[in-house]
Amino acid sequence: MFKKIYLAVFAITMAMFTSCNSDGEPGGYMQGVFTVQNSIGSPVLWMDGGPVVYPSATAAQQLMANKNFANAERVLLVVTYKDADVTGDSSTSLVVKNAEVAQGSVVPTSVIRTPEMAEADMKFKNYLADDSISTFYDISRENGIWFYKGYMTAQFSSTYYVANSTGILPTVLATYTADENDPKEVSVTLYLNKHKKSSANESGQPASFVSSFSLGDMQQHIMRHSLSEVNITINYETKQGKQQLKKTVKREDFTKPF
């Protein structure tokens, strides 16, 4: 039951990020992406009609210059905060104050919320009772250009956008790499073991978490390369040592109900 609920929530969240290109086909990105400043002066990227996390041009340059990401089509990043006090209401941004960065090196400034996130107030505050919050960044590359997208926390059905102005790249959570000669083969490397606050890590479920994520993530990959299926190899590490999960995602999987 929990798995079905989680996948349903996941599917809804992924749908928020599935856009159309100029030809009306899903999976594309708007051309002419531009940056704006939010109320506290932090850079935020707007794309596909919504706000998108943009950890500054410096972070983008660091990412593109990092040889470990040379062939990655998608990079997932995480920053964990602890000892955070939150203020705000359903119509304004939640401001994170006095927060110490537990993992990564991005100084938190505010959590920018969409109107649909008002109902998540109680869940958000209940989680903060644990004095920590993890925020994920989702970065994709199209034709050699990096695009930044906000990504949900593992605990919520809503999506949180975190603005920052430090220009320092957060800790890498996972990398997705497709074989250039055979795009049907996709390799995923997880670093969840580095994040002690991660609920997915503590419960020993990184494989199921990323397996669910990959189902939605690979939809764009399959359509982009006109594939019938994708073979995903997920490498991760737990307290029991190195683990590997293999999963095949077929095009027809996206037409089946979760």
Predicted regions and their residues:
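First exposed extracellular module after export/assembly in secreted or surface-exposed proteins
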Residues: M30-F258
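C-terminal motif of bacterial Sec signal peptides marking the signal peptidase cleavage site
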Residues: A15-S19
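Positively charged n-region of N-terminal signal peptides that target proteins for export
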Residues: M1-I5
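Bacterial signal peptide processing site
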Residues: N21-G24
